[in-house]
């Protein structure tokens, strides 16, 4: 019997999302106009809370859909205007270009990145050194590339290796269902469970590595570019400005990596089983023998393009997004990718998030029009200049750990810039606040997958169920890093940021605009 029209409409609305989630969104959409009539300020804060809720529930439904509905309604009822949304999007065009072109550009360098991580995995036998290498490699790559892409590459390596051993363990060469363990005997299951633990720890080290490296440069995370643009910094300026906080945090983060592996705590310490290593090594040897000159040329070309990418970013030869576009053109031209559909695949990872970011800017427009953050900013600015840095860091950290850090970073840097332009703070203080906002947005956000897009990408990937990586387990494994990165970052903002920045100015390395 066919379902009713109403039931069909209900099922289509937000698709497979739970009924309670659909009902919650409908209630939000009904309440917002009613509350806006009574108190625009309260309605504005309610919208922000609802939007954060959609980000926190990203596993139930991609936030673009519910967040987009809320944003459309906000414009429709007058909380902001379509013109203001356009202005916010135009002001952040560089970030949108970064997401569209840089992420797509790195897609065409995946073979090189896969090669690097595969060599690391099979060449280093010490688990402590391997974990450190993965963390450092992810940090270095994320300083120049998009963190999502770096994590995507590591996921590809892990899924590939898991599939190789799973086929051997199940004695089925055509094993397509990697979640089906029914054909694996008891002995192999023990080894497989150990292998899962090994992959879980490597993925978490790599994920945290992207946060450690991503905070250091203006292209490491999308919000970094927003903050750099607001402060008028180029690549070198941004790196030096952040270094009083980010360099000590990087060192402590890498020491944490070694410590958790040494103590075998928080789910770390599992080694690669020897039987698995033998299977993977055999497969890698076969792959290398089958690699043609054409394949080798592709790797060499991608490495040269990587050098171009780093050089162009460091010398600020063009806007970041345009450098990404040059990577697409060079990589496709020189590696033989000429089909439109093959090129189109490169954009599938970045465009949904680009659309979501545009919705962020709609909510930012509401925040500005309704002056939602004015009381908070007023409270912070009442404190001494020294205390302002820590307060901005803490407020950013709290919100970033449960919400998307692009959203949070954009809000706070806009408010700080408005305070500077109104004369409430000096330009020098504003530049220090920009560092506190950037580090506060990036570092504590490793606490949950909601804050770090790379973590959320890992949690929703095909790999997560294979290696038994749940939301709770990810939060638990991230806990030592969360504590170390947050506390060390706060101490650096409190004690080293101002004096080291002053010393940099005296040396002539940086200058106030």
Curated annotation (Swiss-Prot):
Pfam families: NhaB (PF06450). Its main location: membrane. The keyword Transmembrane applies. The chain crosses the membrane at residues 23-43, 52-72, 97-117, 144-164, 202-222, 238-258, 303-323, 348-368, 391-411, 447-467, 475-495. Keywords: Antiport, Cell inner membrane, Cell membrane, Ion transport, Membrane, Sodium, Sodium transport, Transmembrane, Transmembrane helix, Transport. It catalyses: 2 Na(+)(in) + 3 H(+)(out) = 2 Na(+)(out) + 3 H(+)(in). It is found in: Cell inner membrane. It comes from the Bacteria. GO terms for molecular function: sodium:proton antiporter activity. It is a multi-pass membrane protein. One of its GO terms (cellular component) is plasma membrane. InterPro entries: Na+/H+_antiporter_NhaB (IPR004671). HAMAP family: NhaB. Na(+)/H(+) antiporter that extrudes sodium in exchange for external protons. PANTHER family: NA(+)_H(+) ANTIPORTER NHAB, TRANSPORTER ARSB-RELATED. Belongs to the NhaB Na(+)/H(+) (TC 2.A.34) antiporter family. This is Na(+)/H(+) antiporter NhaB. The gene is nhaB.
């Amino acid at each position: 019997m066919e379902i009713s029209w109403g039931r069909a409409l209900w099922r289509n609305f937000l698709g497979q999302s739970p009924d309670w989630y659909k009902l919650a969104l409908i209630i939000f959409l009904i309440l917002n106009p009613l509350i806006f009539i009574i108190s625009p300020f309260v309605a504005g804060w309610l919208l922000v809370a609802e939007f954060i809720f959609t980000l926190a529930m990203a596993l139930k439904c991609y936030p673009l859909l519910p967040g987009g509905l809320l944003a459309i309604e906000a414009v429709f009822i007058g909380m902001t205007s379509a013109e203001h949304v356009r202005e916010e999007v135009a002001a952040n065009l560089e970030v949108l270009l970064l997401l569209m072109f840089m992420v797509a550009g790195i897609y065409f360098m995946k073979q090189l990145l896969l090669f690097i991580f595969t060599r690391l995995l099979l060449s280093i036998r010490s688990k402590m050194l391997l974990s450190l290498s993965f963390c450092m490699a992810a940090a270095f790559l994320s300083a120049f590339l998009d963190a999502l892409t770096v994590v995507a590459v590591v996921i590809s390596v892990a899924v590939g290796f898991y599939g190789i051993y799973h086929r051997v363990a199940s004695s089925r060469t055509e094993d397509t269902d990697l979640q089906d363990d029914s054909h694996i005997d008891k002995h192999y299951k023990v080894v497989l469970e150990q292998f899962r633990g090994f992959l879980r720890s490597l993925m978490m080290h790599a994920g945290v590595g992207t946060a450690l490296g991503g905070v250091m440069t203006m292209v490491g995370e999308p919000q970094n570019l927003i903050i750099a643009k607001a402060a008028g910094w180029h690549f070198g300026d941004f790196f030096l400005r952040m270094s009083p906080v980010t360099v000590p945090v990087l060192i402590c983060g890498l020491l944490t990596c070694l410590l958790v592996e040494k103590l075998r705590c928080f789910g770390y310490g599992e080694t690669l089983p020897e039987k698995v290593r033998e299977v993977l090594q055999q497969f890698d040897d076969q792959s290398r023998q089958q690699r043609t000159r054409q394949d080798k040329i592709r790797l060499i070309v991608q490495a040269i393009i990587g050098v171009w990418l780093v050089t162009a970013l460091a010398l600020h030869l063009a806007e970041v997004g345009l450098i990404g576009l040059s990577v697409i053109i060079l990589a496709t031209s020189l590696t033989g990718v000429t089909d439109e559909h093959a090129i189109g695949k490169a954009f599938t990872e970045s465009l949904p998030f680009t659309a979501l970011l545009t919705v962020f800017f709609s909510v930012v427009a509401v925040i500005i029009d309704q002056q939602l953050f004015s009381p908070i900013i007023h409270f912070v600015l009442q404190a001494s200049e020294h205390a302002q840095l820590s307060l901005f860091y803490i407020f950013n950290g709290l919100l970033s750990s449960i919400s998307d850090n692009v959203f949070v970073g954009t809000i706070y840097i806009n408010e700080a810039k408005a305070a500077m332009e109104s004369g409430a703070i000096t330009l020098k203080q504003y530049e220090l606040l920009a560092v506190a906002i950037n580090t506060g947005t990036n570092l504590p956000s490793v606490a949950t997958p909601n804050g770090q897009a790379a973590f959320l990408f890992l949690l929703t990937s095909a790999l997560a169920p294979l290696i038994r990586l749940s939301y709770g387990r990810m939060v638990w494994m991230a806990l030592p890093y969360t504590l170390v990165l947050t506390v060390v970052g706060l101490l650096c903002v409190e004690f080293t940021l101002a004096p080291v920045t002053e010393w940099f100015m005296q040396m002539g390395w940086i200058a106030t605009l």
